[in-house]
């Protein structure tokens, strides 16, 4: 099985490199120095030695030559082939639901859905390092309140990978969190998918992408989606993933506006009334969006009414964004179970988000649609940035013991 291609946004460090300067590439020496003994004018090569005789001076010259460039390049190539990686940095992007239909309730208590999921350019960065421990992973993060124990989906994903493959790698992980929690953006699910991808890289890609996708459904319904190529029609609980041929254009901008309050997914589903959901066939919505692009009518989210019951201020926020729209947004809708409101068509939020004190703690970010190639992980666009008033969540470190 071919190992996956690593992107520019990912850092790989081979083992057993004596020269730190060569840690990110091959050893290369530009000079080919030699050791010279004596002097002379005429020389001939024999077994790596240059021996020259001078009749006039009655002396012999011996010159020992080392082709250091070739020697060390060969050694570096051997190290690159045999060494594993010890550290890896990966981008962990979130997603939005361009439309979300709830089509029924299952006997197991879950709901069936049909949704167009799409990865976007807002995301976290996760740094993985091999740990000498053979019993425990160690997770740290820059945000207070994010669990760093085995309840975190990153740790669950690493435990799942070891269970499925029999590998025994444990890790130090640092999560640089930019995606807000309780936002309906799938940040935790993306982190879990990224951890599975990373564990597979450290193990020499012994599992296929299809296997990673299938395994991931055991710990979260949204996780399998991130093993698509970035745009997929998802059904079942979300774990049935079908890549779509025509992802939405990467140059179509959007703005994300999330109030500080979160929506409880469980509470939103508890208030859902199937008789009040849209009756539009989700395949009709999919065809409309993939063929004709984003429109307000096509961006249906059946979870909006119950989410607005849970958080009435979210309904007011959506209405104000629509009212302030001067043709900038093709559609304004809630992602997932909330509480993020998405405006497609412009990266700029309405002015009231900055001017009104009621929204002073609101998270705001511009974003664009994002995809990936098969056997490559997502890479962060250079232009991605956060634009909230505080820029990032509080920089409070917490580390598991």
Curated annotation (Swiss-Prot):
<dbReference type="InterPro" id="IPR013750">
    <property type="entry name" value="GHMP_kinase_C_dom"/>
</dbReference>
<protein>
    <recommendedName>
        <fullName>4-diphosphocytidyl-2-C-methyl-D-erythritol kinase, chloroplastic</fullName>
        <ecNumber>2.7.1.148</ecNumber>
    </recommendedName>
</protein>
<dbReference type="Pfam" id="PF00288">
    <property type="entry name" value="GHMP_kinases_N"/>
</dbReference>
<comment type="pathway">
    <text>Isoprenoid biosynthesis; isopentenyl diphosphate biosynthesis via DXP pathway; isopentenyl diphosphate from 1-deoxy-D-xylulose 5-phosphate: step 3/6.</text>
</comment>
<keyword id="KW-0414">Isoprene biosynthesis</keyword>
<keyword id="KW-0808">Transferase</keyword>
<dbReference type="GO" id="GO:0005524">
    <property type="term" value="F:ATP binding"/>
</dbReference>
<feature type="transit peptide" description="Chloroplast">
    <location>
        <begin position="1"/>
        <end position="52"/>
    </location>
</feature>
<dbReference type="InterPro" id="IPR004424">
    <property type="entry name" value="IspE"/>
</dbReference>
<feature type="binding site">
    <location>
        <begin position="180"/>
        <end position="190"/>
    </location>
    <ligand>
        <name>ATP</name>
    </ligand>
</feature>
<dbReference type="GO" id="GO:0009570">
    <property type="term" value="C:chloroplast stroma"/>
</dbReference>
<dbReference type="InterPro" id="IPR006204">
    <property type="entry name" value="GHMP_kinase_N_dom"/>
</dbReference>
<comment type="similarity">
    <text>Belongs to the GHMP kinase family. IspE subfamily.</text>
</comment>
<keyword id="KW-0150">Chloroplast</keyword>
<keyword id="KW-0067">ATP-binding</keyword>
<dbReference type="Pfam" id="PF08544">
    <property type="entry name" value="GHMP_kinases_C"/>
</dbReference>
<dbReference type="InterPro" id="IPR020568">
    <property type="entry name" value="Ribosomal_Su5_D2-typ_SF"/>
</dbReference>
<dbReference type="InterPro" id="IPR014721">
    <property type="entry name" value="Ribsml_uS5_D2-typ_fold_subgr"/>
</dbReference>
<dbReference type="GO" id="GO:0050515">
    <property type="term" value="F:4-(cytidine 5'-diphospho)-2-C-methyl-D-erythritol kinase activity"/>
</dbReference>
<dbReference type="GO" id="GO:0019288">
    <property type="term" value="P:isopentenyl diphosphate biosynthetic process, methylerythritol 4-phosphate pathway"/>
</dbReference>
<keyword id="KW-0934">Plastid</keyword>
<keyword id="KW-0809">Transit peptide</keyword>
<dbReference type="GO" id="GO:0016114">
    <property type="term" value="P:terpenoid biosynthetic process"/>
</dbReference>
<keyword id="KW-0418">Kinase</keyword>
<dbReference type="InterPro" id="IPR036554">
    <property type="entry name" value="GHMP_kinase_C_sf"/>
</dbReference>
<keyword id="KW-0547">Nucleotide-binding</keyword>
<comment type="function">
    <text>Enzyme of the plastid non-mevalonate pathway for isoprenoid biosynthesis that catalyzes the phosphorylation of the position 2 hydroxy group of 4-diphosphocytidyl-2C-methyl-D-erythritol. Is essential for chloroplast development.</text>
</comment>
């Amino acid at each position: 099985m071919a190992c996956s291609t690593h992107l520019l946004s990912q850092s790989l460090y081979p083992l057993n490199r004596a020269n730190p300067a060569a840690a990110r590439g091959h050893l290369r020496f530009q000079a080919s120095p030699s050791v010279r003994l004596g002097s002379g004018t005429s020389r001939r090569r024999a077994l790596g030695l240059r021996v020259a005789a001078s009749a006039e001076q009655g002396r012999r010259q011996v010159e020992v030559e080392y082709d250091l460039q070739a020697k060390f390049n060969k050694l570096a190539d051997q190290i690159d082939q045999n060494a594993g990686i010890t550290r890896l940095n990966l981008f962990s992007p979130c997603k939005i639901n361009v439309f979300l239909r709830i089509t029924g309730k299952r006997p197991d208590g879950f709901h069936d859905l049909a949704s167009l999921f799409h990865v976007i350019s807002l995301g976290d960065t996760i740094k993985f390092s091999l740990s000498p421990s053979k019993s425990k992973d160690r997770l740290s993060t820059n945000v207070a309140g994010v669990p760093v124990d085995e309840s975190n989906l990153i740790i669950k994903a690493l435990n799942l990978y070891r269970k499925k493959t029999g590998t025994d790698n444990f890790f130090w992980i640092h999560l640089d969190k930019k995606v807000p929690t309780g936002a309906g953006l799938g940040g935790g699910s993306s982190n879990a998918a990224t951890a599975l991808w990373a564990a597979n890289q450290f193990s020499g890609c012994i599992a296929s992408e299809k296997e990673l996708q299938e395994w991931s459904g055991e710990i979260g319904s949204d996780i399998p989606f991130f093993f698509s190529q970035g745009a997929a029609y998802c059904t079942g609980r979300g774990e049935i993933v079908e890549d779509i041929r025509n992802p939405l254009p990467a140059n179509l901008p959007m703005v994300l506006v999330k109030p500080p309050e979160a929506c409880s997914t469980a509470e939103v589903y508890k208030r859902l009334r199937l008789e009040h959901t849209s009756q539009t066939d989700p395949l009709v919505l999919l065809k409309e969006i993939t063929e004709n692009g984003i429109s307000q009518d096509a961006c249906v989210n059946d979870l909006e009414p119950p989410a607005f019951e849970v958080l009435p201020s979210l309904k007011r926020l959506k209405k104000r964004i629509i009212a302030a729209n001067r043709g900038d947004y093709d559609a304004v809708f809630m992602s997932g179970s909330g509480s993020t409101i998405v405006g497609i068509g412009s990266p700029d939020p309405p002015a009231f988000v900055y001017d009104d004190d009621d929204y002073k703690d609101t998270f705001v970010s511009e974003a664009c649609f994002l995809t990936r190639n098969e056997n490559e992980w997502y890479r962060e666009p250079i232009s991605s940035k956060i634009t909230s008033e505080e820029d990032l969540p509080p920089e409070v470190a917490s580390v598991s013991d």
